[in-house]
Amino acid sequence: MENILCAANAVNMMFYFNEEKYGILPQDVKDELKVICVLYCSDVGGMISLSFDESYKLIITTMEPIDEIGAELKVKKIQSEKAELFEKLEEFAEKLDKLSAEKEKKS
């Protein structure tokens, strides 16, 4: 099951951040994620989402970009430029899930 971290949609000009699950992230990280998503949508259109798979790998999913080739290049650029941030987010998501599981066991 994938856990959505954030998403943006160029058509509706909307940004979504999963505040319920990841709200404890620092505001500057939330802001950076918003910039990543909104700039992607502004540049190539369509939708973008950042989520974690079962092994806590950050997955970038895109849909319906106006420019398919530009979208692929933009995703590769994001992955390259934000590799350190994404690695830390993956570690954070894994630790957060482990803490949540421990809390559930205790209650």
Task: Specify the residue positions occupied by each region the protein language model found.
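Intrinsically disordered, low-complexity segments enriched in glycine/proline and serine/threonine
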Residues: 5, 35, 75, 84, ...
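Short acidic DE-rich linear segments
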Residues: 1-3, 98-107
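Short, flexible coil/linker elements and helix-boundary hinge sites characteristic
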Residues: 23, 41, 82, 104-105
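Negatively charged, low-complexity tracts enriched in Asp/Glu with abundant Ser/Thr
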Residues: 1-43
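Amphipathic protein-protein interaction modules
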Residues: 40-95
